C-alpha cells in the first residue's frame, strides 16, 4: 500500500500562497499603523491649534473701545490683505487692541492693561524658531515711554509663537450686519483701516499642515462677532 504525501509542486504552491498571505498581511498592518500614527499626529496638532485659535477668538471678543469713542489711530483695528492665505507669503496680518489675559496669559504684565496684538504666519526661521502662527503684544503708551532705551529697528513689545504647523492665514471682516451681497450672504471686506470703528464680524481661516507631504493644508474656520461693535457705532458722549 502506497503512503499518501505531498508532491514537490504542491509544496511549492503552498509556500507561494503562504508567502503572498504574509506579504499582504504585512502591507495591511503597515498601512494601518501608518494611518494610525498620522491620525494621532493630526489630532494632536488640531487640539493644540484649537486651543490657540480659541485664545484668538477670546482676544477678539475682548477688543477694546473707549466709551467716549475717542479712538487713537495707534489703537485702532487694522487688517492687511496679502492674498488668499494659502502659504506664509500670502497670509494676512491682523492687529487690534484688547483687554484681558486671552492670548498673553494671566501672568503677563499686560493682562491688566489695554494692549495691542498682532498675529501673522511665518515660515521657519531656524531649528529653534519653527514656523507657524506668531503673535506680538505691546502697550503703546508704555513702549513709547521706553522708546529711547530701544534700538530704532527693534519693534516694541514681546513676540512669541502661538501654534506651530499653521502654514496660512486669511482674514475678512463684515463692517455692518446689514451689509450683504445679492444672495443675502454677509458682505466681507479684505482690508480694514477704520481706526475709529470696530467691524461687526471677523472671519478667520487658518490652514494647518498635514502629516502627509504633498497633501493640501487643512482649513480651520472661525467666525467672531465683536461685542463692542455697537458702542463703536454709537459712542457715549
Identify the function of each model-found stretch.
Residues 2, 46, 50, 156, ...:
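Short, solvent-exposed loop/helix junctions and linker helices
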Residues 2-29:
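N-terminal single-pass transmembrane signal-anchor helix
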Residues 5-8, 12, 35-36, 99, ...:
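General secondary-structure edge motif
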Residues 26-152:
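Extracytoplasmic beta-strand-rich oligomerization domains located immediately C-terminal to a leader/signal peptide
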Residues 89-91, 157, 199:
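Sequence-level motif detector for i,i+2 pairs with an aromatic at +2
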Residues 160-237:
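Short linear sequence signals and composition-biased patches located at protein termini or domain-edge surfaces
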Amino acid at each position: 500500500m502506497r503512503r499518501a504525501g505531498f508532491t514537490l509542486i504542491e509544496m511549492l504552491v503552498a509556500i507561494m500562497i503562504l508567502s503572498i498571505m504574509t506579504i499582504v498581511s504585512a502591507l495591511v498592518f503597515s498601512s494601518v499603523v501608518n494611518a494610525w500614527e498620522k491620525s494621532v499626529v493630526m489630532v494632536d496638532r488640531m487640539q493644540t491649534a484649537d486651543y490657540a485659535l480659541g485664545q484668538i477668538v477670546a482676544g477678539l471678543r475682548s477688543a477694546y473701545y473707549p466709551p467716549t469713542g475717542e479712538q487713537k489711530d495707534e489703537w485702532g483695528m487694522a487688517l492687511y490683505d496679502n492674498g488668499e492665505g494659502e502659504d506664509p507669503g500670502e497670509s494676512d496680518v491682523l492687529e487690534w487692541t484688547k483687554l484681558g489675559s486671552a492670548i498673553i496669559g494671566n501672568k503677563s504684565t499686560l493682562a491688566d492693561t489695554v494692549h495691542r496684538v498682532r498675529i501673522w504666519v511665518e515660515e521657519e526661521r531656524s531649528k529653534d524658531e519653527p514656523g507657524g502662527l506668531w503673535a506680538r503684544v505691546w502697550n503703546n503708551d508704555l513702549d513709547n515711554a521706553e522708546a529711547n532705551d530701544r534700538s530704532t529697528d527693534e519693534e516694541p513689545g514681546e513676540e512669541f509663537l502661538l501654534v506651530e504647523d499653521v502654514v496660512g492665514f486669511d482674514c475678512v471682516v463684515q463692517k455692518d450686519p446689514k451689509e450683504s451681497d445679492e444672495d443675502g450672504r454677509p458682505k466681507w471686506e479684505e482690508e480694514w483701516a477704520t481706526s475709529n470703528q470696530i467691524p461687526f464680524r471677523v472671519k478667520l481661516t487658518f490652514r494647518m499642515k498635514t502629516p502627509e507631504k504633498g497633501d493640501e493644508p487643512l482649513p480651520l474656520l472661525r467666525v467672531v462677532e465683536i461685542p463692542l461693535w455697537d458702542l463703536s457705532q454709537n459712542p457715549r458722549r
